[in-house]
Amino acid sequence: MDTGSANLTHHFLIAMPNMADPHFARTLTYIAEHSDQGALGLIINRPLDMTLETLFERVELPLEADGFAGQPVYFGGPVQTDRGFVLHRPAGDWHSTLRVNDDIALTSSRDILQSIGSSGEPQEVLISLGYAGWTAGQLEDELAQNAWLTVPADLGIIFDLPPEERLVAAMQKLGVDFAKLSEVAGHA
């Protein structure tokens, strides 16, 4: 397969068992953008020891809407870990939004946090600190080295499953049992 021509926007990256980088070992990453210039995504199965209530206190915003306070904040990746990123549906219209498609977007502006805190909109959110980024050709090289499996994204996995079930659910979409994957990859 020519990985150089595959656009992985709105796909999951599943870290192979031999992933050496501890930031990505046993992770499921949602790719929000993939182009000739590189790729950007969020790790969606690594909650931090922080809730939205704590995050909102730290950024000095009220969290009045019900149902959000106990939700975890996620480690989105090793880039800009001091910045918040909100993966959400519906896409909506915010100041700094990367619209992946009509159903999902990635926003990094404060206005979405203000809306979540006051009105609870958008209702389906995954909030992370940091993101995963790849320079031009870097992700393609990692795919060629069998560092990742790819599968089209499923919003139900992101928004409806607890974080500890997301990796297994994505693997099941491929019909693969993670426990049976070899740590040694070969090339035919």
From Swiss-Prot:
Cross-referenced SUPFAM superfamilies: VC0467-like (SSF143456)
One of the record's GO cellular component terms: cytosol
Pfam families: DUF179
Superkingdom field: Bacteria
Similarity section: Belongs to the UPF0301 (AlgH) family.
Protein name: UPF0301 protein azo3459
